[in-house]
């Protein structure tokens, strides 16, 4: 019988506690988009900072526990750990973005994505918080750099997804398709500001995605004797990279912006999620870690 991943021994309890604070933040931002109350927004952000701090502690606790039981590589390769790390970098992306832009309304979307990832990690029978020894091929110094680079990219693309949604809503209003502005849209910066932020965030994410793929190729060569094997995960990573390269290319050479770029940001993140989770669940391959009975490999 499945039981939730809640244990103080391996640190998973603290991720569950962080989920509670993320949900509080989500409800706060949900209230904010209807009320426009800045105090509620500030309290929601504080709750998110608390969640992020708890997650930082949880990762530290979990990694220390892994070393204590004789596992020398950070526990990041299975579904549970990747989900909580995904939530972590998505929250980090929003925190950093909020420093430079007045995107409080984005908090509603970001906290929803983070809460969904944490809830999936905690309650899905596909995920387990038990820390297992990694296979020999994963016992490499490449592992940590590969994962961090990719998930920094995922966090940036998650932020661009939220910004893309905000842009499409704001654009619809500014183009007079919506006669009444409404409370929510009044809290969203101009479409020009959002468009600029989308571009910068995607460039940031693409740099890390490129680094992650290159590191992964070098790692594959040292572990399996080849840089590229057209594994389903590798193929979809390349597709994801091409989607965002298209974004940058069209922006620079064709002057694309606005609505087209916002749609690419939204669709691109759907591709990211499929590459990250869908491929591993639906298409068995070298990187499968979510399919029952498969080897946990990121």
Where are these regions (language model features)?
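Polytopic transmembrane helical bundles with strong interfacial aromatic enrichment
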Residues: 1-298
């Amino acid at each position: 019988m499945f039981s939730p991943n809640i244990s103080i021994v391996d640190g998973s309890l603290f991720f569950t506690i962080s989920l509670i604070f993320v949900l509080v933040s989500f409800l706060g931002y949900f209230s904010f988009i209807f009320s426009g109350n800045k105090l509620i927004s500030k309290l929601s952000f504080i709750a998110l900072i608390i969640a992020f701090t708890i997650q930082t502690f949880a990762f530290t606790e979990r990694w220390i526990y892994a070393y204590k039981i004789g596992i020398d590589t950070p526990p990041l390769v299975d579904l549970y750990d990747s989900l909580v790390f995904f939530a972590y970098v998505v929250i980090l992306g929003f925190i950093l973005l909020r420093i430079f832009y007045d995107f409080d309304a984005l908090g509603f979307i970001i906290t929803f994505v983070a809460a969904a990832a944490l809830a999936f990690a905690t309650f899905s029978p596909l995920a387990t918080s038990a820390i297992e020894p990694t296979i020999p091929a994963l016992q490499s110094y490449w592992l940590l750099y590969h994962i961090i680079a990719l998930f920094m990219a995922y966090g940036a693309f998650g932020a661009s997804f939220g910004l893309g949604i905000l842009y499409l809503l704001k654009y619809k209003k500014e183009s007079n398709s919506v006669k009444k502005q409404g409370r929510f849209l009044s809290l969203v910066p101009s479409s020009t500001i959002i468009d600029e932020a989308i571009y910068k965030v995607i460039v940031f994410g693409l740099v890390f995605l490129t680094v992650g793929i290159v590191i992964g190729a070098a790692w594959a060569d040292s572990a399996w004797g080849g840089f590229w094997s057209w594994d389903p995960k590798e193929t979809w990573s390349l597709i994801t990279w091409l989607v965002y390269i298209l974004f940058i290319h069209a922006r620079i050479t064709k002057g694309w912006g606005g609505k087209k770029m916002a749609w690419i940001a939204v669709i691109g993140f759907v591709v990211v999620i499929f590459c990250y989770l869908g491929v591993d669940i639906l298409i068995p391959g070298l990187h499968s870690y979510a399919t029952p009975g498969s080897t946990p490999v990121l």
